[in-house]
A protein has these predicted regions:
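Aromatic-rich, lipid-facing transmembrane alpha helices and their immediate juxtamembrane interface loops
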Residues: 1-224
């Protein structure tokens, strides 16, 4: 296992993707870790609800909603071109939700926003740099830092010998993952809780609604 910075992640990446397409939403690899992971997510969210940590909850839902929109678009790309930007293998998971996301990954992302927001500390608007008009807050630094960490972890997973995470396109890799995927994820987690109440509702309800509509339309038609 080693870091991969650009695709393809292996010599047989294209064949691994084709195999993964046949395993989407198959229960052939199901095991009981599925239930345990779900229980952990429930515990985390209900603990935040009990403690009335609404901003942390909003951060979690914001990132998770963006995550699902990205996964849907990635699956559409896979349907249209034959190869998604990223893909998970059937050998590495109990259940593939969409071509680019396994159950385990999705549940991790459901908690990633909460983790990111909590790491900002008691004063997320603290200015790390404050020089005249040039100001950088902890929210931005935290988002970039988490995005970099997750991009490096994905690079590591892409180098897994069992093809756990697959990149096919030679131009797709850690730099684009960092900039186009993880920075938006963690910007949503760190900044949406700061929105005014009406803006929060509009952002979350719109994104959740779009995701539900896309899933309800695209899955029955066999597109994703």
């Amino acid at each position: 296992m080693h870091f991969i910075f650009f695709g393809p992640s292996s010599g047989d990446a294209a064949e691994r993707v084709k195999a993964a397409f046949t395993a989407v939403r198959s229960t052939g690899n199901f095991n009981w870790t599925f239930i345990f992971i779900l229980a952990v997510v429930f515990y985390v969210y209900w603990t935040e609800i009990k403690n009335k940590n609404w901003d942390a909850l909003i951060a979690g839902v914001a990132l998770y909603s963006v995550h699902w929109l990205y996964e849907i678009m990635n699956a559409v790309i896979g349907y249209a071109t034959g190869y998604p930007l990223w893909c998970v293998s059937a050998d590495s998971t109990t259940f593939i939700l969409l071509i680019g996301v396994s159950w385990e990954l999705s549940m991790m992302f459901s908690m990633a926003g909460i983790i990111s927001y909590k790491m900002l500390g008691d004063n997320p608007d603290k200015l790390i740099i404050n020089k005249g008009k040039f100001k950088i807050s902890m929210r931005l630094v935290g988002a970039i830092g988490m995005a970099l960490l997750f991009a490096l972890i994905e690079s590591f997973l892409a180098g897994a010998e069992n093809g756990a995470f697959i990149w096919v396109y030679p131009w797709w890799g850690v730099i684009l993952v960092f900039i186009t995927t993880y920075i938006p994820f963690f910007l949503a987690a760190n900044y949406v809780p700061k929105f005014k109440p009406k803006a929060k509702k509009i952002f979350l309800l719109t994104l959740v609604g779009i995701n539900i509509l896309l899933l309800a339309f695209l899955i029955p038609f066999g597109i994703i």
